[in-house]
Regions:
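Alpha/beta enzyme core
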Residues: 1-83, 89-100
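Extended, intrinsically disordered, low-complexity segments
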Residues: 86-128
Length: 128
């Protein structure tokens, strides 16, 4: 169950009430969100939730508090970390630079050193 209480600035107590209600209704896990640059309110929520519920998985998406380590998150009872858009956001500048270089040089040779070999891509597909 996804809880947006912290994003809506309704506070930790509202988030906790919702989390406990969702678990009572059969939720398999709790995903708690925050836009804050520090994990303080996430940690407060997790510590209070864990004081009453030690088994329901807690999921976080630390996009805004990205300096927080997985070990720090785990220390507060968080079970799953989702890196929601970091791969897409890092891939786009590389694709943009490659496209610009192809346009600049009117060919693809200058981007060869940045390309993954086709054989390696095929190997990845075979593993799936």
């Amino acid at each position: 169950a996804r809880i947006e209480s912290l994003i809506l600035e309704k506070g930790v107590e509202d988030a906790l009430a919702r989390a406990h209600a969702f678990v009572a209704a059969g939720a398999d896990g709790i995903m708690i969100h925050s836009r804050k640059k520090t994990p303080d309110e996430i940690f407060e929520f997790c510590d209070k939730f864990r004081a009453e519920n030690t088994t329901t998985p807690i999921v976080v998406v630390p996009t805004s508090y990205n300096a927080t380590t997985e070990a720090e998150l785990a220390a507060h009872g968080i079970n799953l970390v989702i890196y929601a858009n970091q791969l897409t956001r890092s891939a786009f500048p590389a694709m943009q630079q490659t496209a610009e270089d192809i346009l600049r040089y009117h060919r693809a040779k200058e981007v060869d050193d940045r390309l993954m070999p086709i054989k390696q891509i095929i190997t990845l597909i075979d593993e799936l």
